[in-house]
């Protein structure tokens, strides 16, 4: 293990954030003096970031916590093009209105992890639409494009993998790495930025930006990537059978976010405590040694600490209490995720397949609902569903005015009268 001088590099190394660094000694020296200005770019392809983005956000947090300056770069410009990295097909082109709406929805996430302001290490937020949308095409080709080798661009994973699979790569996507590289140069000129961070799939684009900066006469630029995380079983972080694990509370309830972390595989608990919480390392080492049933205590701490960072301590504690009430005490917690239904719907009767598939999304389809019923996996008010033609009516309402639907032991939704 490399011995670094700076707190920033030591924290990243001890917690498992470092995958590749372009010039470790030079970057370490800058960080030791509090002179690193680093950015991570986030394209606005959805109304929320997801758990897969958390690694880079946590790196921005630790950068600031160790006295250096973070920049959160909104991809208002690059989203109009679409990043081909890790994609098997061309991204859907969003309207400018959709991009702007997504950008506004995403912005609030960062203030949970970093402090914005005018101080030395205070974070700033930038938007590459500010300079990319003003580029003149001919000038871009002359001043920027001449520094890029098509031969080298064709060797980049984001391009090469698509071509090797004989999958279409549009000209607009091919230009993405040029725009990302120019972002680095522009941030260097405007804000003295000297480091770009990102996932390991971005290494090629980032070092291309480092090279462009050298060719265009900026100060020395640096690259640092974190691993692309998968779980111990090989699943991609941030994805579940039900879809993406969103960070915005209006797209994924804090309770469901808590449950995502609570369901962490045993082999991942120690690693995730290092990456996704602010707990001190000695406490993490203690929790990582727990075995058998005791490891569930570590999982609850992981879930509560990760949820507190994203949604606040009150929401995290409420989620933990809801889980305890639901699973350990056998109750129907009012803080479970809920879906409103009308009195008219209930009076007419709601088919159990519709309730589980369409109303609550506990299952993906009517077919899956039927399979779960046969396997004994669906329950209404804690009673197994045995008849796929069952209809929910007002008689199924509890004294609290809700109907509890469950799939397995850990997925629950309440139907609540509007």
Swiss-Prot record:
For this chain's UniProt record, which GO biological process terms are given?
A: tyrosyl-tRNA aminoacylation
Motif 'KMSKS' region is found at 236-240
Pfam hit, one = tRNA-synt_1b
Which positions does UniProt annotate for ATP binding?
Answer: 239
Is rRNA processing one of the keywords? no
| Broad enzyme group | ligase
- The Enzyme Commission number assigned here is 6.1.1.1
Q: Which domain of life is it from?
A: Bacteria
Chemical reaction(s) catalysed = tRNA(Tyr) + L-tyrosine + ATP = L-tyrosyl-tRNA(Tyr) + AMP + diphosphate + H(+)
Motif ('HIGH' region) positions are 44-53
Q: Where is the S4 RNA-binding domain?
A: 350-418
The record lists L-tyrosine as bound by 39, 176, 180
* Localization per record: Cytoplasm
MF terms from GO for this chain are:
ATP binding; RNA binding; tyrosine-tRNA ligase activity
GO cellular component annotations of the record: cytosol
Q: Which family does it belong to?
A: Belongs to the class-I aminoacyl-tRNA synthetase family. TyrS type 1 subfamily.
Sum up the protein's function in the record's words: Catalyzes the attachment of tyrosine to tRNA(Tyr) in a two-step reaction: tyrosine is first activated by ATP to form Tyr-AMP and then transferred to the acceptor end of tRNA(Tyr).
Subunit structure, interactors included: Homodimer.
Protein name as catalogued: Tyrosine--tRNA ligase
């Amino acid at each position: 293990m490399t011995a670094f001088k700076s707190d920033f590099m030591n924290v990243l190394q001890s917690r498992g954030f470092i995958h590749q660094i372009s010039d470790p000694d030079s970057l370490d020296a800058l960080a030791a003096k509090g002179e690193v200005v680093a950015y991570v770019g986030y394209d606005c392809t959805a109304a929320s970031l997801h758990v897969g983005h958390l690694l880079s956000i946590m790196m921005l947090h630790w950068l600031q916590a160790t006295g250096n300056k973070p920049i959160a770069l909104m991809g208002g410009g690059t989203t109009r093009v679409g990043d081909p990295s890790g994609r098997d097909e061309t991204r859907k082109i969003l309207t400018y209105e959709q991009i702007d709406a997504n950008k506004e929805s995403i912005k609030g996430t960062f203030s949970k992890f970093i402090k914005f302001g005018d101080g030395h290490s205070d974070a700033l937020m930038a938007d590459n639409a500010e300079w990319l949308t003003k580029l003149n095409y001919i000038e871009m080709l002359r001043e920027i494009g001449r520094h890029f080798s098509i031969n080298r661009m064709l060797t980049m994973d984001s391009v090469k993998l698509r071509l090797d699979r004989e999958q279409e790569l549009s000209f607009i996507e091919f230009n993405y790495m040029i725009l990302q590289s120019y972002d680095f140069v522009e941030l260097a000129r405007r804000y003295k930025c000297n480091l770009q961070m990102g996932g390991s799939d971005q290494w090629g684009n980032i070092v291309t930006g480092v090279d462009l900066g050298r060719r265009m006469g900026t100060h020395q630029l640096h690259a640092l990537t974190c691993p692309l995380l998968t779980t111990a079983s090989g699943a991609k972080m941030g994805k579940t059978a039900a879809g993406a694990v969103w960070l915005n509370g209006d797209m994924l309830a804090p309770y469901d976010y808590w449950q995502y972390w609570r369901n962490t595989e045993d082999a991942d608990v120690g690693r995730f405590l290092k990456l996704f919480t602010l707990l001190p390392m000695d406490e993490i080492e203690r929790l990582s040694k727990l075995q058998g049933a005791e490891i569930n205590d570590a999982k609850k701490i992981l879930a509560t600490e990760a949820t507190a960072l994203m949604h606040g301590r009150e929401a995290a504690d409420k989620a933990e209490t809801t889980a305890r009430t639901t699973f350990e005490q056998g109750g129907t917690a009012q803080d479970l995720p809920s879906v409103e239904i009308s009195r008219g719907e209930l009076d007419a009767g709601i088919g159990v397949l519709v309730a589980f598939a369409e109303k609550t999304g506990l299952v993906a389809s009517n077919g899956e609902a039927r399979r779960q019923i046969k396997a004994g996996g669906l329950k209404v008010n804690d009673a197994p569903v045995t008849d796929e033609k069952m209809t929910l009516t007002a008689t199924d309402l509890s004294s609290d005015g809700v109907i509890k639907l469950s799939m397995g032991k850990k997925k629950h939704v309440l139907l609540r009268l509007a």
